[in-house]
């Protein structure tokens, strides 16, 4: 048995053990009590209770709040229970203790997985979404550490086995992690990319941009309206962005080169797998110079056929905050044995420079104006400085339902910066529904 234990301890790979189809997991679990999953601040979000008769029950003390990120350890596993299965089933108890346990027939204690999650910020996000479906994800842009990952609707991982048919049945989306796998029309948060392309094509004259908004714009018989048909009057690029003027950005969309915008979006990780260990889906974008005026106008204000995930938009906000450098997002800070001794430490790693420092500074200024003079004003005058872009995305042409977006970041001396993406489904304007969610997370994270 000791030889078997050493073989799996030091030879077999993470991928081999983590596979939910690996029958040897059953043998492994007969010798190890599955370790804990913890937040960065020591809250246990998954643990194994061992009864007096030696039976084991996997418990999730916070229930639904960490459902999608912690996952579950039955029915094929999900979340961190799946991703970190090898670590949780591996024991780094002191070697002599393992030998004594083996001789006495006692199980060893598995290693603990300590995440990057911030317990209080996670709770703030979960409660702020209330009964709405949607997602919140927040990341430290200078490290890539994921501080918050919330998705609704959710499920109770404590009763997942008995609830399996209902949560996994036809029509149910409770198991779906909207934060990483959700694909949504971006609405006006896409104006980040449209504005950047205009800047790229007009590096010395973008400040000269001017548009007189009367509430709508028509081209080739197709009309785009501003929200509520509101007239924004004379605007430069900054005001157009801050007020989220659809008419002005449709005009900008007609001015930029669609092929170049398509290349920009490819550089910004559209149509690509995101660099994260968690299951995620690609964002989708396609537009070229053969597109009609109608499709161009729709696409450059975030409608059309474009789809994005909250994770992707949070990463883009992170690169903007971090002067163009995108860090790899990650959820596990380190693993430790049952006594708290370090086993393995994960470290921040840069993915790539996806925009120049000057490009990032341009977008930083636009996102600051959204808070100081635009649709993100509820985030102004705080102890922290906030930057962002709101969005209100039409769900389909046949309904008035809209999803609310906020994408941005916060900064405060003495704290790590925090980027955030919020999507509130079937709600209303981003300024009304998504910004307050972001504010509650920022308030808690920055101790407002």
Where are these regions (language model features)?
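Periplasmic/cell-envelope proteins involved in peptidoglycan metabolism and beta-lactam response
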Residues: 1-164, 174, 183, 209, ...
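Beta-lactam-recognizing serine transpeptidase/beta-lactamase-like catalytic domain environment
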Residues: 41, 101, 142-188, 193-427
């Amino acid at each position: 048995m000791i030889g078997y234990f050493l073989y799996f301890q030091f030879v077999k790979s993470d991928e081999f053990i983590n596979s939910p189809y690996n029958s040897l997991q059953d043998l492994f679990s007969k010798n190890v009590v599955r370790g804990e999953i913890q937040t960065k601040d020591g809250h246990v979000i998954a643990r194994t209770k061992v009864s007096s008769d030696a039976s084991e029950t996997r418990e999730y003390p916070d229930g639904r709040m960490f459902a999608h990120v912690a996952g579950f350890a039955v029915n094929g596993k999900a979340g961190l229970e799946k991703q970190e299965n090898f670590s949780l089933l591996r024991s780094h108890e002191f070697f002599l203790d393992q030998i004594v346990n083996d001789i006495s027939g006692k199980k060893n204690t598995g290693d603990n997985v300590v995440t990057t999650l911030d317990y209080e910020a996670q709770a703030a996000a979960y409660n702020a979404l209330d009964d709405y479906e949607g997602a919140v994800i927040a990341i430290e842009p200078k490290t890539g550490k994921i501080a918050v990952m919330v998705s609704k609707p959710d499920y109770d991982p404590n009763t997942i086995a008995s609830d399996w048919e209902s949560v996994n049945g036809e029509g149910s989306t409770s198991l779906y992690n909207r934060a990483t796998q959700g694909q949504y029309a971006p609405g006006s948060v896409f104006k980040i990319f449209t504005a950047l392309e205009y800047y790229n094509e007009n590096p010395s004259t973008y400040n000269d941009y001017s548009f007189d908004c009367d509430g709508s714009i028509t081209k080739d018989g197709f009309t785009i309206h501003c929200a509520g048909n509101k007239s924004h009057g004379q605007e430069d690029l900054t005001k157009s962005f801050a007020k989220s003027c659809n008419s002005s950005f449709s005009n900008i969309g007609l001015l930029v080169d669609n092929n170049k915008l398509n290349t920009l979006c490819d550089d910004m990780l559209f149509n690509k797998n995101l660099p994260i260990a968690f299951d995620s889906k690609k964002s989708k974008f396609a537009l070229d110079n053969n597109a009609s005026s109608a499709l161009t106008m729709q696409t450059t204000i975030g409608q059309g056929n474009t789809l994005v995930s909250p994770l992707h938009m949070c990463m883009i906000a992170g690169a903007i905050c971090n002067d163009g450098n995108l860090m790899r997002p990650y959820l596990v800070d380190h693993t430790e044995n049952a006594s708290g001794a370090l086993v393995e430490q994960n470290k921040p790693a840069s993915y790539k420079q996806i925009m120049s420092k000057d490009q990032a500074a341009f977008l930083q200024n636009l996102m600051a104006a959204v808070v100081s003079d635009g649709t993100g004003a509820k985030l102004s005058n705080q102890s922290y400085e906030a930057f962002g872009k709101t969005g209100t995305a039409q769900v389909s042409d046949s309904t008035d339902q809209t999803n609310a977006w906020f994408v941005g970041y916060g900064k405060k001396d003495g704290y790590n910066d925090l980027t955030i993406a919020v999507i509130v489904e079937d709600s209303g304007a981003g300024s009304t529904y998504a910004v307050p969610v972001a504010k509650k997370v920022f308030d808690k994270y920055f101790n407002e």
